Amino acid sequence: MKKALIIVVLALMATVTAHAAGDIVGKWKTIDDGTGEVKSIVEITKKGGKLYGTIVQLFNEDPNYDPLCTECKDHLKGKKIKGMQIIDGLTLDDGQWVGDDGILDPDNGKYYDVKIWVDKEDDSKLNVRGYIGFLYRTQTWIREK
């Protein structure tokens, strides 16, 4: 009986640890830089040790809002933005998820080198830093509850 109880406690501890602060997997609200309003929700998943992100919801006053990626130059041109994978195959490097051309901005159709990490002081915030050469811009996404 004690052995079974210990196994259950250890299993619960492992589950809690997997969902502890710093876990990047889940849904994140993206914030419009200009308005400060929530723009979309991106669901981040891990598969085969790599990180992926898909737009699962868009916010707009128009209930029929369902835009296409008109600025994309590749196989995503003309595809719906909702359901689009915008984070592709990032790898973990020293506590940050990184990738060359790892994130797509569907507003302009451009790919950027990227680093993504959960904020150390507030695990409800995700720092998403896009790079062009040495120049970068960091957005803060908010964990969906």
What are these regions (language model features)?
Residues 22-39, 138-145:
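K/E-rich alpha-helical interaction surfaces of small helical-bundle regulatory domains
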Residues 1-4:
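Positively charged n-region of N-terminal signal peptides that target proteins for export
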Residues 45, 91, 117-120, 142:
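Well-ordered beta-strand positions
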Residues 32, 37-105, 111-113:
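Central antiparallel beta-sheet cores of small beta-barrel/beta-sandwich binding domains
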Residues 106-107, 117, 121, 125-138:
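Short, exposed beta-strand-loop hairpins at the edges of beta-sheets
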Residues 16-21:
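Sec/Tat signal peptide C-region and signal peptidase I cleavage site
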